[in-house]
Amino acid sequence: GTKTGQGMKRGEQWPVPSTIAGVGIGLRTPHIPEVLDTTPAIPWFELLADNWLAAGGLSLDYLHAVSERYPLTLHGVGLSLGGTDPLDLGYLANIKWLKERCGAVWYSEHLCFSQFRRHHYHDLCPLPFTHEALRHVIERIRKVQDFLGEQILIENVSSYLRYRVSQFGEGEFLARVAEGADCLLLVDLNNLYVNQINHGQDARRVIDCLPAQRVREIHLAGYQEKAGFLLDAHNHPVAEPVWWLYNYALRRWGQVATLIEWD
C-alpha cells in the first residue's frame, strides 16, 4: 500500500500522477450530455465534489461515462480544512469513495474555514497568517492525507477582510503549509490578483515565495468589480492582469496544468 503522511520516511516521495496536463475546464451539469455526445478535444475536466455528493445529486452513470473518456480531478469546497470543528470523517470517506469511483487523478480543497461550531457559512473564510494557524492547518492536512492515503492540493482563497495580526505574508504562509504538511499547491491566480487590489499585496511576490515543485495546478477566472473592491465571481472572462500573472507564473514554474473557471 501507499505510505502516507507522517509515516513517510525522509527522502521518500509520494506517487505523483501525471495524466493531467494542458488546459482543462470545470465540468458543469448542463454541459454533460453535449460532452458525452460530441467528445470535445478538452484535455481534462474538474468535478466539483460537493455537487456529486449532494442528496439528489447528479447521476453516477454520467460520472462513469465521462470518466471513461477523460482524465478527471476532484475539487472540494466543504471540508473546512482550516476550521476548529473536528474534521468530518464521513465527508472525507465520501470524497475517497467518489475519487475512487471516477478515477480522479487528485483531490484539491481550499485553505480556509467554512464552518464554526457546526454552523456552515456560505463562504470560504481566509485564515489568519499566524504561527498558531500554521501549526493547526498543517496537522489537519496531515490527517486528511493519512485518511485518503495520498497528497492533496490546497488552494489559496480570495479575501475581503484583514486580520489585525499577521505574522507571515500570504506566499510565505502557503509555502510553509505545503512544506510542513508535505502537500501540493493549487494556485488560483485570480484570487491573488483580487487580494492584490483589495489589500495592496503584490501578487508577484506571493508567486515568488511558492516552491515550484509543489505547484501542481493553476486556476484562472474572471472577477467582478464592486464598489471599492474586486469579487472572485467566475462570471467574467479572465482579465488581462490575471493573464499577465499567468505568464509570470509559468516563467517561474514551467508548464503547469491549468483550469479556467466559469460559473
Protein language model regions, located:
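N-terminal pre-domain/capping segments
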Residues: 9-97
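Active-site-proximal loop/turn and secondary-structure-junction residues that shape catalytic pockets
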Residues: 29-31, 49-51, 60, 78-80, ...
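Distinct, well-ordered alpha-helical segments
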Residues: 32-36, 163-179, 195-208
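Acidic (Asp/Glu)-rich catalytic clusters
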Residues: 34-40, 57-74, 90-105, 144-147, ...
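Conserved, mostly hydrophobic/aromatic
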Residues: 45, 107, 188, 218, ...
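Gly/Pro-rich active-site loop or hairpin
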Residues: 54-56, 71, 124-134, 195-253
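Active-site acidic/histidine proton-transfer and metal-coordination neighborhood
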Residues: 88-185
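Conserved active-site loop/cleft motifs that coordinate metal ions or position small ligands
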Residues: 257-263
